[in-house]
Amino acid sequence: MLDYALLDALVAVVRHGSFDRAARALNVTPSAVSQRVKLLEERVGSVLVKRGQPCVATTSGALLCRHTERVQLLESELGGQLPAVPALADALGDEWPTLRVAVNDDSVGTWFIDAVAAFCNERRMLLDIVIDDQDHTAQRIRDGSVQGAVTTQAEPVQGCRSTRLGRMRYRAVCSPAFFSQHFAGGVNRDSLRRAPCVDFNPKDELQERFIRRVTRADVDPPRHWIPHVAGFVRACVTGMGWGMCPDRMTADLMQRGELVEMTPGRALDVDLYWQSWRLSIGWLDDFGAMLRKRAGEFLD
């Protein structure tokens, strides 16, 4: 029989990335968390956490994390379904269930919050959003640190199901002054090699995809690193560099003349999918169905 106090310690370490932060979340000492994880590893006969900065789950650890969080979600659902049993309802039904999801920053900054707000309020559900690049969010559900993910990966992660949400369209944009300074002679291999671009983080490959489409070559321009979606767009508006920005964030700026499209008609489309556990959990299934429906109102 699994000891859920030990499993909770494992989940906390994987979720928070360190034993110290897990200890604060559980209101115990780091030593206690370490002892619980070590005891669990001894009982299952396998290393469950790769110690590092951050700590991450091993394959076995990810399986146990997913199991533990599924049990927690099922208990939350059970508490809401048994109001006629006061003791059980009191034990399980008072806390709002929490859904931990991985979402790319562009989606959070444009459509995701508007899509899910009403559902969260009506169903008394809390969101714990993990920000990651859209090409890497699927890894979060694979390693057991989230229960769902908005991702570019169409193929379902093992034990999950995948549904298409829609498409985000990105365009290469910059300020008019920046365009005149760097691209007066055209957007080509030489000008793209010299002009600074804006990258969200090292995982952001949209700028590289655009460069390869235009030049059919690998070009390494000077780069600003700005891991904040509003700051990213602002850097383009103020002439710091050019970048790939979603239409939903730049349409008004382009209409006002604060941004210009560098190569009209050469947008990049990014298909987004919702991946979540295949295990049927009522409100998690309802969340996925709602997200698919609402995403259609915001995405192409």
Describe the residue ranges of each PLM region.
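Short helix-boundary/capping micro-motifs
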Residues: V11-N27
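A late-sequence structural motif
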Residues: P264-D300
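A short LG(V/I)-centered, amphipathic sequence patch enriched
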Residues: E41-S60
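C-terminal regulatory
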Residues: R161-M240, M254-A267, E297-D300
